[in-house]
A protein has these predicted regions:
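Non-heme di-metal
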Residues: 1-64
Length: 64
């Protein structure tokens, strides 16, 4: 389980980094692209919630 937990923790960190990347892209994007980036970013935040839920279930602790 330690390897599984480590993989989930890395996946969570990567998803958070991806959200930050999309936010930075939105700051520079032409106005017409922002809606698309918002949609993609919403998917990423859903992924964060799902992975955090898996980690919480695995450890019995809330994920901050």
């Amino acid at each position: 389980m330690d390897e599984y937990q480590a993989l989930l923790e890395k996946a969570l960190a990567d998803e958070i980094s991806t959200v930050r990347l999309y936010l930075a892209a939105m700051a520079k994007a032409p106005p017409g692209d922002v809606a698309i980036l918002l949609e993609v970013n919403a998917d990423e935040t859903d992924h964060i919630a799902l992975i955090a839920g898996l980690l919480s279930r695995l450890t019995g602790e809330p994920v901050d």
